Amino acid sequence: MSISLLGRIVSQQFSGIRAAEPGRSLYLPFTLLLKQPGAYKVSLHRYVHSTQTKSHLSFLMNNNDITPFQKFTVKVLKEQCKSRGLKLSGRKSDLLQRLITHDSCSNKKSSVKINEPKKKRILINDPIKITKKLVSDKTFRTIEKNISSLQNTPVIETPCDVHSHLQPRDRIFLLGFFMLSCLWWNLEPQESKPTIDH
């Protein structure tokens, strides 16, 4: 079947719907629904990338300059991530996403007001007179507390204090080490002697 014959068959079956001709657009049944008032317009453009080339997204930098999104370079984004202590690897979109989320989180944190309890101010009208007796009594009490706290701490015994003698496995290890070092020491002079061949 040729394309022109196929086009005639389709045009006869769907009245009011034009068939595809070479170089012409194809009208499908759902296009009639879209032509009704109140229907949404649908554009059938194929985008190569998921992001548009021009974006009107603005971003607030550290120095409070609003810079357009398309003027950012990867180097600038990495410097901004480094200054904020964020991860430096990834694509440009990843870096932007990290910066935007970090700034939005930091703006939320800064907008939250922390209620600190008010400190009570003590007004002293009469200064306190300190005598030598008060000072000496105070130092004696602190020394007494320190000594009692030292006496209350448990004494931890180390393994050397508990077992002053060698364990059987320690004796076997030391004996084996001593024997190997003696054998090695005896073999060393025999290797260094020159041999005379007749």
From Swiss-Prot:
- For this entry, the transit peptide stretch runs 1-55
- Knockout mutant characteristics: Increases frequency of mitochondrial genome loss.
Q: Name one GO cellular component term.
A: mitochondrial membrane
By its UniProt entry, which InterPro entries does this protein fall under?
SAP_dom (IPR003034), SAP_dom_sf (IPR036361)
Annotated PROSITE patterns: SAP (PS50800)
Membrane topology is: Single-pass membrane protein
| SMART domains, alphabetized | SAP
| Protein's cellular compartments | Mitochondrion membrane
Which keywords accompany this UniProt record?
Membrane, Mitochondrion, Transit peptide, Transmembrane, Transmembrane helix
**Transmembrane segments annotated in the record for this chain:** 172-187
- Mitochondrion among keywords: yes
Domain SAP span(s) in chain numbering: 69-103
Q: Which SUPFAM superfamilies does the record match to this protein? A: SAP domain
Q: Which family does it belong to?
A: Belongs to the AIM34 family.
Additional facts recorded: Present with 2820 molecules/cell in log phase SD medium.
- Name of the protein: Altered inheritance of mitochondria protein 34, mitochondrial
Source species, please?
Saccharomyces cerevisiae (strain ATCC 204508 / S288c) (Baker's yeast)
List the gene name: AIM34
